[in-house]
Amino acid sequence: MNPSAPSYPMASLYVGDLHPDVTEAMLYEKFSPAGPILSIRVCRDMITRRSLGYAYVNFQQPADAERALDTMNFDVIKGKPVRIMWSQRDPSLRKSGVGNIFIKNLDKSIDNKALYDTFSAFGNILSCKVVCDENGSKGYGFVHFETQEAAERAIEKMNGMLLNDRKVFVGRFKSRKEREAELGARAKEFTNVYIKNFGEDMDDERLKELFGKFGPALSVKVMTDESGKSKGFGFVSFERHEDAQKAVDEMNGKELNGKQIYVGRAQKKVERQTELKRKFEQMKQDRITRYQGVNLYVKNLDDGIDDERLRKEFSPFGTITSAKVMMEGGRSKGFGFVCFSSPEEATKAVTEMNGRIVATKPLYVALAQRKEERQAHLTNQYMQRMASVRAVPNPVINPYQPAPPSGYFMAAIPQTQNRAAYYPPSQIAQLRPSPRWTAQGARPHPFQNMPGAIRPAAPRPPFSTMRPASSQVPRVMSTQRVANTSTQTMGPRPAAAATAATPAVRTVPQYKYAAGVRNPQQHLNAQPQVTMQQPAVHVQGQEPLTASMLASAPPQEQKQMLGERLFPLIQAMHPSLAGKITGMLLEIDNSELLHMLESPESLRSKVDEAVAVLQAHQAKEAAQKAVNSATGVPTV
C-alpha cells in the first residue's frame, strides 16, 4: 500500500477486539517499535470508565502506521488477538457500503485472521471481522475492501465456494434499511404459512389434508421431537401467494380438536425477535408514560404498616390505583409504592405526606424513579460538586473531610487570601461571619445544643484581623490517642496552669474517642499576628438521635448532628472514603438520613451507590494520568 496515499493523511489506526484490561501503556509498549507515536486513546464508557474494547493509535508518519498494520494485525495482547485497521474519521465512507461484502455460512473455526488471509488475495482490505458472541463465531462476517472492483472480484470468485468443507455465500453488503425494505416487500408476497397449537396427534398427512383445499402445496411438515411426537406446530409452503393468504384468512383462530389454532405468515427467527423486541419496547415505554408523575416512592415505613394501612394514609389525596409495601420473608422492607390516578393527586400527596410522622416514623415521600434515573442523578450531582470544587482557586476543605489520619471531619468553608488556609471548625466559626445569622448574634458553637456536649469553660481567644506573615497556617495532626482518660468533665483552667501545660516546642494534638464520638483536642501554631488556641472539648457520649430531637434543633445544627452520627458508621465500612461519602449523603433530606441511621441496609445501599460514583471518577482520573505518563503528550 502506498504510504503517501491521500486516504490516510492522519496515520491513525483503529485497534479493536481489545481485552477489557488493556491500557494505553500496554498499547504504547506494543506499537512503539513500529515508529514514533503521537498519542494513544483507549475508548471507555463515560460513567463506569470500563474499556469499550477498542482504541486509536496515532503515529507521526503514515509509513510507520502501515508497518504496524502489516506486521501486528491479529497479534495477541492479554490472550486476545487484536484487529487493526485504518481509522476512518468520515462515517459516510464506512456506511456507504462501497467495497464492503457480506459472507455467511462460515465454519465455526474461521476467525478474523483466517477470513483476512482468504480474501486479501483480491485487494487491499480496510477492515475484516467475523461476528461473534459469548459462544464464538455466529457464522457470518464482513470484509471491507479499499475499492469496489476488489469487492466485486471477491464476490465473483468466492460466492458458492467451499471454506472448511462448507459452502459459503458471498454478496454485496446491504444496510439494515435495505434489508428491511426487501423483507417487507417479500412479506407481502409470502407463500410459507406457520401453524401452531394443534396438539400432539397431528401428522404431515393430516395437515396436508387440512390445508390442501386452499391450493397446491410444495411441502408440508409437522415438527417433531426425538421420539417422533408432534411439537404442536408446523409449516405449509404453497405455490402461490394467493393460496397462502386465503389459508391464513380462513384458518387463523379456528378450533381444531378443542384448541384454537394460530395460522400466519412464517417468519425468520431474526425477524420474529425484532418484532417481539419492538413490541416489548413499546409496552415498556407505554408503562413508563402511564406511571410518569403518578407513582410515589414511600420510605421509612413502620414495620406494622401493611398495604391497607398505606392505602388508608394516602387515600385522602385522591384515587389510588395501587398501594404496595415491599416484603421479604413476610416482613416489611421499610418502603413501598403508592400509585395515583393523576399527577396532580400525586403532587399533593408528596407535599402533604413527606416528613409526616405515621405510626412512629417520619415518612420520606417522592416521585418514584427507575434505578437508571437514580444512578444518573447521583452521578450528575457528584460531577457538579467536583466541578464547583475545582472552580475555587483557594484551598478548600472538603465537606466532612477527615484530617488524616485522625478521622475528625471539618465543615466545608472556602478560605480567602487574607486568612490562614486551614482552621479548626470552631475557629472558623469565630472568624467567618455567616449570612444565616445577624451581625449582632453570635454564631452557635459547632457542638452547641448537642446532647452530652460540654461547652468549653475557657473564654474564646482573641484574634487579629491583620493579614498573617504567611499565607497559610500549617495544620498538624497525630494518630496518637489519649490513654487512661476517664470520663471526667473538664473545668476552667488557671492561666498559670495553661501556660505551664503548653511547651515552647510545637505540640502534637491527641485524640480520644468516647462512646462513638470524636473528642478532638487541637493546638494551632499560628503566626505572630494571629494568636489562637482551641480549648479541649470533652463529649461524654451521645444519646440516640430521634425525630423529635432533630426537629427541636435549629436548622443549621441538624446536619451537624446527623453528620456526627453518620461518620463513624460509614468509616467502619469505607475508612478511606468516609469523609467524602458523608459529605455526599448529607445533601439528602433529613428524614431519609434519619432512616439510614435506623436501617443499616438502607445506609449500606446508599453508601454503595456513593462509592460507585467515587470509583468511577477516580478511574477516569487514573486513566488520564496513565495516558499522560505513557505518551508524554495530551490525549486526542
UniProtKB/Swiss-Prot annotation:
Residues the record lists as Phosphothreonine modifications: 319
CDD domains: RRM1_I_PABPs (cd12378), RRM2_I_PABPs (cd12379), RRM3_I_PABPs (cd12380), RRM4_I_PABPs (cd12381)
Main subcellular location: cytoplasm
Modified residues (Asymmetric dimethylarginine): 493
Pfam families recorded: MLLE, RRM_1
Gene3D superfamilies associated with the record: 3.30.70.330, c-terminal domain of poly(a) binding protein
One annotated GO molecular function: poly(U) RNA binding
Keywords: Acetylation, Cell projection, Cytoplasm, Methylation, mRNA processing, mRNA splicing, Nonsense-mediated mRNA decay, Nucleus, Phosphoprotein, Repeat, RNA-binding, Spliceosome
Modified residues (N6-methyllysine): 299
InterPro entries in the cross-refs: Nucleotide-bd_a/b_plait_sf, PABP-dom, PABP_1234, PABP_HYD_C, PABP_RRM1, RBD_domain_sf, RRM2_I_PABPs, RRM_dom
Family the UniProt entry places it in: Belongs to the polyadenylate-binding protein type-1 family.
Known role: Binds the poly(A) tail of mRNA, including that of its own transcript, and regulates processes of mRNA metabolism such as pre-mRNA splicing and mRNA stability. Its function in translational initiation regulation can either be enhanced by PAIP1 or repressed by PAIP2. Can probably bind to cytoplasmic RNA sequences other than poly(A) in vivo. Binds to N6-methyladenosine (m6A)-containing mRNAs and contributes to MYC stability by binding to m6A-containing MYC mRNAs. Involved in translationally coupled mRNA turnover.
Subunit annotation: May form homodimers. Component of a multisubunit autoregulatory ribonucleoprotein complex (ARC), at least composed of IGF2BP1, PABPC1 and CSDE1. Directly interacts with IGF2BP1. Part of a complex associated with the FOS mCRD domain and consisting of HNRPD, SYNCRIP, PAIP1 and CSDE1/UNR. Interacts with PAIP1 and PAIP2 (via the PABPC1-interacting motifs PAM1 and PAM2). Interacts with PAIP1 with a 1:1 stoichiometry and with PAIP2 with a 1:2 stoichiometry. The interaction with CSDE1 is direct and RNA-independent. Found in a mRNP complex with YBX2. Interacts with TENT2/GLD2.
Designated name of the protein: Polyadenylate-binding protein 1
Organism: Rattus norvegicus
Source taxonomy: Eukaryota, Metazoa, Chordata, Craniata, Vertebrata
Gene symbol of the encoding locus: Pabpc1
